[in-house]
Amino acid sequence: MNMLAYFLYCRQLLLAVVLIEFPPRLCGNTLRFYSYHLPLSTCHISDSFYLTSRTTSNLLFCHLLYCHQKSHQKSHQKKTTGYLKLFSNTIENIKNMFNSSPYTLSTTA
């Protein structure tokens, strides 16, 4: 993993703290701001969806974290538990996705 990718992962931890408390509203505002459409109602990401910029990767992170947090809530019924585990699991999931075809992370944004 290159340094830019690592920086992007680490930078999102601050965003993650806020997203855990207000995922739908914050993600929705972010999506509208960048004029992207990435539905929060489904956790399916198409194989044809490529990460081509920091903006896109941030939006995808927002989407994945929201989906991950929703499943975490269903499992534990308490959003105040497992923050650290949620962060590490989400970051690990994104790393794995970046390392598997057809997803790519552009170093130019």
UniProtKB/Swiss-Prot annotation:
Key words of the record: Signal
Signal sequence, renumbered to the chain: 1-28
Name of the protein described by the UniProt record: Uncharacterized protein U78
Upper lineage: Viruses, Duplodnaviria, Heunggongvirae, Peploviricota, Herviviricetes
